[in-house]
């Protein structure tokens, strides 16, 4: 299995020594997202940036893995909301990187479905262990469960 996207940037007039960081990301499904660098790196704060995209990818992967595990356990999820945070810092090598990701999911189960904290933690642990995007990142990812 493989995935492909197309990232397109087109030069445009800019002050001497500057360049426009806005670009388009086209996904295999045909959907397009307007993107830029983060505002801290002279990007457009109205567009998605790579750091947010990475954070959304790991959050989405964890959620979908969690939902699969819950479904297999016949635990009907009514709502799942995550407000993840990514921290940028310097690695030991001196390179700037996303050094810590904290997922902060809140899960609401369907009426009549009671899940204790221990079971919820186990499902999140299993989801994290099986999320291939989390497994692809070398740095620290934490799951802080909102109960």
Give residue spans per PLM region.
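Extended beta-strand/beta-hairpin segments
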Residues: 1-56, 67-147
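Alpha-helical metal-binding/catalytic segments enriched in His/Glu/Asp
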Residues: 61-62
